[in-house]
Amino acid sequence: MLDKIIIKGAREHNLKNIDVEIPKNKFVVITGVSGSGKSSLAFDTIYSEGQRRYVESLSAYARQFIGQMKKPEVDSIEGLSPAISIEQKTTNKNPRSTVGTVTEIYDYMRLLFAHIGTAHCPVCGTVVDRKSVEEIVENIIEKFEDREKMIILSPVVREKKGTHKNLFLNLVKKGFVRARVNGEILYLEDEIDLDKNKKHNIEVVIDRLILKKGDNEFISRLTQSIETGMEVSEGKIIININGIDYNYSENYACPNHEDISIPELTPRLFSFNAPYGACPECKGIGQKLEVDENKLILDKTLSIEDGGIYVPGASSRKGWTWDMFLSMCKEFDIDYTIPVEDIPQEQMNIILHGTDKKFRFDFESKDFSFHGMREFKGIVKNMEKRYYETFSDSAKEEIENRFMIEKECKICHGKRLKEEVLAVTINDKNIIDLCLMSVKDCLEFFNNLVLTQQQEKIAKEILKEIRERLNFMINVGLDYLSLFRPTKTLSGGESQRIRLATQIGSGLTGVLYVLDEPSIGLHQRDNDKLLLTLNRLRDLGNTLIVVEHDEDTMNQADYIFDLGPGAGEFGGNVVAYGTPEEVKQNKNSLTGKYLRGETKIEVPKERRKSDKFIELIGAKGNNLKNITVKIPLGILTVITGVSGSGKSTLINQTLFPILFNELNKGKLYPLEYKSINGLENIEKVIDIDQTPIGRTPRSNPATYTKIFDEIRDIFAQTKDAKVKGFSKGRFSFNVKGGRCEACQGAGIVKIEMNFLPDVYVECDVCRGKRYNKETLEVFYKGKTISDVLNMSIDEAYEFFSTIPSLEKKIKVLKDVGLGYIKLGQPATTLSGGEAQRIKLAAELSKSSKGKTVYILDEPTTGLHFEDVKKLMEVLQRLVDKGNSVIIIEHNLDVIKTADYIIDIGPEGGDKGGNIVAFGTPEEIAKSRKSYTGKYLKKYLKK
């Protein structure tokens, strides 16, 4: 068996026909500048071929469901193991998916609660236990003294009004003699007169016995009596000894509330993804989509007539719906010509929520007329009706995005399960209480769990699995997460590390794992734990190929491959390979230069100072501890702290929505805070995030940055275009005219295959050029519009060097490290980091007046040391123009270049949410409380 993966002639994307030998059962890092071909080698060649071979071994029937990966451009790969990819792009957006479900910890917890959980009445909290007849008999004999007198009662009425005459008659017919009515034993043959307006309790006397231990005849009679009593009362029995009632049931039934019964405790009962246990109101999601009345108010400064309020079905301001709305306004004296903010609250309530009072409505049109009384249910109800009655997915989606908000379910209060399921506990905690704890606290609970000998025997293996999986999560730096956290809210790095923890839990050996920057989103303190985990995965007998830029990860690796030397067309070669020490000594390796300290990102000679601040007072969203924070303006501020400390809560979920609403007239929902000062010092806020720049292949860097508008202008002004009478619109691939109609300007055509995946092939009419023949006959400097779209940013910069306005915009894309991507590269093929840098470039190319706050969350994602250096130069330029830049970041090369740092923590989750330290990097490095300071101290000395 080969001890290497031997790759020959890899040509995928920009790879230059390279041959690579990767040692097996080792921790291998592939590094290089952005666009050098790292992902092309690791994911698009090695993993893709491993996956393709596995799928190809399946039957044609199975392949139609699984799909198939295309064969990568490579001559041969030998020694390939079964491959598993752990990327950041595959975050689960399913609202039902939680950290607990994807790690399978919740499945084991369901098993645990089903076997050793204690059920309670959800109304009064009384413990409800279920016992078989044999167990009840055993319990009575063990629990009570010999020769004790007992009465066996069967409860038939519990706290119900009525005379119950028919019940008494039926009991006599069945042969029963006595009953206990409201605590008093009466003969059923006697006249029992009950007040029909009062609540009563009635139990049938089944038998009266004297306890005789070891007497088989007594045990037989007791067993028969209990069975009879349970038949009468559907599984419930009361044993009265010395005037005290002892309740037993073969069902989970409350003795105080006979209408409350808990189903049999099975694992599926504790699943919020199954109807047995899920809250019936929210169907187990914990949230409900509701129309947000604030979103229906479009502009408070406008009148209703001028569009200040959205009236469903009346966007054209004419017709039945609009006329009826105006009739309602006239009936209730609502002035629809004044600004919405001046309408009295009582009248606003009628507009939003309607009224029962009917009004006269007369309507005339060509088609029909109406004269009569109508009722107005309010625009909120009308919008809900439109949402639930439409069959159009796009209409539904528009209403969701524009007018609805997710709110906590009012029945389960966001806990997803039925109340009777939440009443089942272990050590006074229900299953959701445990899921709401941090992983660290949850492990502590299970480590300190006190169980009976019988429970210990049942739960031993289940607890072992739960504890191991929780430990794996802690080892990859996710101790601050809760098991209840929806996976759709996780960052790419978090979701990747969860899958990593799950893989370690699986205990597989002989597997090839391909990972994409697992250190993303991790504080330097947690990185050590991650590296131990990766080494453990390797030591199980697996091969790890990790695409990574983190210095510590490279130093820990067994082997490094450095790709480059540049990006795009200038990359795709193996520049250096070997142990970390060998790569450090390689003169050709840019990575080696940074690792040995020959090249580095310099610490600024002086830090900017600021006398203006935004002061956010009383922030207490998520884990923030009612903090007040002053963020300086006009400088570069970095927000630091361990994973889960509250950085994103403070900046992305509190500060940004406040600024966006106040400055950009937005309608976002910030988390709880008291007040904010200093807004007079800024004019607008821009969040440069990692969401895609477009959802379709038609969006690309050229269209997003508006570069393509100028390029189309240039082509429209050429001699060829003027002769043919072509305007700027002719050079758009999104509209009819100049585009190829066979592929509608996409350049590719999708072919659906039955037993194979959908195949995207080059359009055979335009040959992938997007435009028709006539449009491609127009040339600028010997190039068609299609040729220009296929240029890399670096090539386009040289090509348009004589046009200052265009050269300036393209240079910004170059400066943020995107010289390797193509102008027309589809948005769907860009990573989150690339999308973020395109947005940054778009902002930089705009004329700036200063006084803008830019917010970036981990902009170094996917960046090599050299790319980080370029990025920081660009961000410093933004600040030099009089703007404020706020960055959430773990990268110490970025942190050391900041003017000011705000460190949040000290830990993640509940133990975070405080300001640990603030000041210049030098001041933070002196802080004894700050984990960031501890690691920063070393970097400032470099």
Predicted segments, located by residue:
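Conserved phosphate-binding elements of NTP-dependent enzyme cores
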Residues: 1-942
